[in-house]
Amino acid sequence: MTDQVKLSQYSAILLENARHYGVTDEDVLTAIRTGDLAALSQAEREHYTYEAFLSYAKEHGEELERAVQEGYRITFNTNNGLKNWIAITFDLKPGIDFNAAEGLVDGLILTGEQAEKLRKSLASNWHIADEIDTADGHKELTLRLRGM
């Protein structure tokens, strides 16, 4: 068994942003293997550019290819970073679909599969403080910053 891939919050958000805007995992893998970022250009937005995506990952020893194929754990989540990662990854709107405050995310309703992805990806400085099964088979989650 191999260790779980660790990704910075920066790389995780860029990866999920690409997926959110329709870039397939195969296209992401091709970009990683060839260095040709053209396929990622459709996901570029004001704060999400891919110019440094591969060089940042290489410089920080991130295994992007394995992260795409096997999943990953974020090394550290900031409040805003976690809020943005949740919004992009699960196509949710902060303040509407979930609440995010200092050291707290609540009212987050996910499918079982989404909850599992969150559980596997969430940085260790956060934890799932509460999980309630909803009547329609979803999970309502409360996340807290450790130590708060």
Q: What feature does the model see in each segment?
A:
Residues M1-M148:
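Structural boundary micro-motifs
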